[in-house]
Every structure is written in C-alpha cells, then in structure tokens.
C-alpha cells in the first residue's frame, strides 16, 4: 500500500477512535442523571441540573471536525473558550489560534458564526495600516485589510481556509467622519471595543466585547513567535483625528499610532 494512503487511513482511524471515545464520555455523563424524555424531570420528581458535557481538546481535532461541531450548534458545549490549536503558515511559521468567544459574530446575512478565533501571536512581519499618514476610509479602505485577505490568507493551510466563514464587521470610516462602514471578510483585526469593552481612543460602536477579553487577568499584550513583545493594530480609526488608528501597546495598554507606521498584526477569523 502507498505510504501516503496508509498515513491518511491511519489519521482517519485515529479521528474516528477519538470521536467514539468522546461520544462514550457524553453518554456516560448524561446517564448519571436519568430524566423523563418528554419533560426532562427525573422519575423521582426531583429537579437536577443537567451535567456539563466533557470538553474536547481543540488541538486534537482537525479543522474539518471543528467545523462539523460548529455547524451542529454544539461548539460551545464541546470546546472551551480559551482553548487553542496550532497551525502552520506556508513559510513554515507555526501560529496558534485561540477561541475568544462562541456565537458572537454574524455573517452579512445575519447568520450566527459559532466560533471566533484570534491568533495568540502576531505575524513575524510588521505592517502599515496605510502607506499614507491618513485614516480616511477606515478599515474598509485600508491597505492592511487587503493584505490580510489577499496575501496572508493564502499562507494559511488549505484545510483551515476551507472552513473559515466571512465575518461582518462595523467600523468607523475615519477621517474625522461620524459615518461607519460594513465589511465582510474571512480575516479581520479586532476593534478597540472588542478588546477593551469600551471606547478609549476610538469612535466606539464597533462590535462588542469578546468573552476572552472580558475575563479577569486576561493578558492584552501579545508577542511575536520569538517571544518579543509587540505593539499591534486594531481596526479602529482614532476619534477626532484623521491620521491615527488605535492599537494595543506591547504592555497591553490601549494606544494609537500613525497609519503609515509599521506595527504587529494579530488577526481573527470565524468557523
């Protein structure tokens, strides 16, 4: 038998075995509190809290399996917020995706996207938000948005690209404008409000606080793969300013920077 075929079969059998093991755990857990099938009340008439399902380890699952659980509506039951999965870019860089919330984002048809991920690290290279010192047009017209969704996305492994769903985002159009724009992309950069839960330097109204960042003692700062602390972009144009975008300083504090400066990029995506 061809070695590649053998390896593929072995991997498939391994996935099947893990799925069966998990299903056995679910059945065992649910059997601990038998309930009436119609009203969910136990035969003895007492009300019990349904047991929490055991969680699957994200890194043990393929992207196809993760997407399957997402589409089944069970993602928040079988995976844990904060769990991570590694993936390798086409240049050999290993990155880590973290679950930052469930059922938080939507697509342009207003369908709920079950899982939102964000990279734990920033990309190796730094990027300008725009080649010019302006924020006019906001994230919608930014160079970084084009780079992420034309170049960086092509560096993702094919199995990950296949399951990513375009996500709808509302963002200020910058340039001292009070207007907002809508974008729908596979990859995006988080807004100030999605990270800090409020407007600090931004216009506000750009999404809602992600569950991961809402937790106490969450680290807001990020590092590159070599451990170097990195200043990173947010997609939010700075309020009352035509030149700056918001960002997160290497210490984790809210900050801002000129649009033509080169800074780190941590991106989000939905499955």
Question: In which residue ranges do the predicted regions lie?
Answer:
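Heptad-repeat coiled-coil/leucine-zipper oligomerization helices
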Residues: 5, 12-15, 19-22, 26, ...
């Amino acid at each position: 038998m061809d070695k590649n075929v053998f390896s593929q079969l072995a991997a498939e059998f391994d996935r099947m075995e893990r799925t069966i093991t998990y299903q056995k755990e679910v059945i065992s857990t649910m059997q601990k509190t038998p309930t009436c099938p119609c009203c969910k009340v136990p035969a003895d008439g007492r009300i019990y809290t349904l047991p929490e399902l055991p969680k699957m380890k994200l890194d043990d699952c393929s992207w196809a399996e993760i997407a399957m659980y997402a589409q089944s509506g069970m993602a928040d039951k079988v995976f844990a917020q904060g769990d991570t999965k590694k993936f390798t870019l086409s240049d050999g860089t290993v990155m880590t995706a973290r679950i930052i919330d469930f059922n938080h984002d939507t697509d342009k048809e207003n369908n709920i996207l079950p899982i939102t991920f964000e990279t734990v690290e920033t990309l190796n290279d730094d990027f300008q938000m725009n080649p010019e010192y302006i924020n006019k047009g906001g994230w919608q017209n930014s160079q970084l948005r084009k780079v992420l969704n034309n170049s960086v996305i092509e560096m993702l492994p094919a199995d990950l690209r296949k399951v990513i769903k375009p996500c709808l985002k509302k963002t200020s159009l910058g340039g001292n404008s009070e207007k907002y724009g809508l974008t729908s992309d596979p990859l995006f950069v988080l807004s100030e409000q999605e990270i800090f839960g409020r407007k600090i330097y931004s216009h506000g109204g750009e999404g809602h606080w992600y569950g991961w960042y809402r937790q106490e003692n969450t680290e807001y700062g990020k590092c590159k793969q070599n451990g170097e602390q990195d200043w990173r972009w947010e997609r939010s144009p700075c309020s009352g300013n035509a030149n700056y975008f918001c960002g997160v300083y290497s210490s984790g504090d809210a900050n801002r920077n000129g649009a033509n400066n080169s800074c780190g990029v941590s991106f989000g995506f939905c499955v």
